[in-house]
Amino acid sequence: MNTFLLDYHAILTPKKGFPALFKDYTSEGEARNRLISGCFHLDYLNESDYYRQLRQLESRPFDRELLATILRRQNTRYGCTELHLREIEKLRSPRCMTIVTGQQPGLFTGPLYTIYKALTAVVFAERQKTLFPEYDFVPLFWLEGEDHDYEESAHTAVFSAGGIMHFRPEPFRRMPDQMVAATCFGEDIRRIVADFLDQLQETGNKPLIASMLGDCCFPGNTLEMSFAQLMMHLFKNQPIVLLSSQDPDFKKLSRPVFLRELSTCPASSYNIIAQSSTLENLGYSAQSKPRAVNLFHINHHGQRQKIEYPEDNRFVITPDNIHLSRHQILELCQDHPERFSPNVALRPIVQDTLLPSFACIAGPGEISYLAQFRRNYEQFGLTMPFVIPRGSFTLVEPKFSRFMDKMLRISGKSGFSRKQIYHAFFSDLQTLKRNAERVGENPELDSLFFSIRDRIEKALKDLGPVLAKIDPTLEPMLAASTLQAMKTVDTIEQKARKAGRRKNEELIEQILKTETAFFPEGVPQERLINVFYYLNKYGMELIDTLKNLLAGHSTEAHLIVEL
């Protein structure tokens, strides 16, 4: 299995590639140094920060017993193994830290990067255990089931004969803005599962996949529960623990953070605006727009409702138009913390207040978000955890590996490597396409066939006087032969040019197919395609293979894997 590392700065396809902030964060140099010092607390390249973070977390109070109890109950429901329960038990010790990642639940686990996040958390935790054997590090996946964007969450896609096939089941009696965790599958989930399986090749792995999907995706089950159950199936041999934040007991743990946000708002908003200004002064764009109150209210239908702050000490829950004083909303939160949900700005604060978060595994967009939250962490008396880039892959199937071999031969450049071909594909695909369009063209053909016709005509013309002396009646035959010779040359030229065009068209078609495989619908493969497409073709052990590859490489570069 060949692997190639590509620097994120070199990836400009599709569109503009990765965000500038992320590219600087994963590189070295003055731009990175300014970014770290201005927007983060810890630098994962600085060894002394690791010891500082360990000491700081070890001395902080956490309700580890309740946390372990919640996790044990939740993960048992998800179908965990003894391996996962042993990981949970470690959290009762003050010398145990979490490596946190997370994602909103996706249909059939959603896009590939969800799997890559979980694998990166496992690998990073194991690496820290090797470096600091006196501590334990538990990889933890935060289920963002409180997200209310069902259309985005309940979606997945795979490659099909006609291009890309999308799947999105209809929910059962879903209310507007209802949390994903409270949204159940309707009857059509059975059809969606069947249609999804129809798009997978017949392999020895397909019956197992069909069984997994059938067991986890059925009418009445929630998207969050099915996601968690599938993740447990896929990671049964990996020590990752799942956490659902909408658990009522976990909400009780979250209550102090909610109360502080409500009692001090709009302070969080001002902090994020000030930090965003720092970010923009460094040359980056702010990704998150804070609200005056960075909490939602959850009604009895499981709908997330905005909490507005139109004037001092007055709150309005919309769209129900419920007016509350600060005292009233604080009292509501004190009695019913399960009715509140953090937004994107407050969620990391909740996470790192309640969990001994040594590090969080984040994608390119998430790192850009987190860069806006440093001052808000300080507002809540917290140190940001290490922010580790998640693993990023492009999986290359054998037919596309063979095409890369062909591109290497066509390039005609001695010493040109496979990595350079991939570099060209990811850095400047349009130029590669333009060059391919000229492959079938041969500018030498024009001059070559002109020369051949000229030589034939001259040779036969020189033969004319000789034939006339021998027998004048041979001259018409010579003229006919000259015409026939020219027609033969014309036929050869036409066939040569047709073959060139065919070669050109085949090459362009192969480039377009490869582009679809690497950048389906113009986005990176990892952001759209479902993992079961690859597990079906290459085996369930692909999860372990990718984990081992991550263990041997840095996540500061994109990893191309030839399957």
From Swiss-Prot:
Top enzyme class: ligase
Keyword terms of this UniProt record: Ligase
Pfam families xref list: CC_BshC (PF24850), Rossmann-like_BshC (PF10079)
Enzyme Commission no: 6.-.-.-
InterPro entries recorded: Bacillithiol_biosynth_BshC, CC_BshC, Rossmann-like_BshC
Family, per entry: Belongs to the BshC family.
UniProt protein name: Putative cysteine ligase BshC
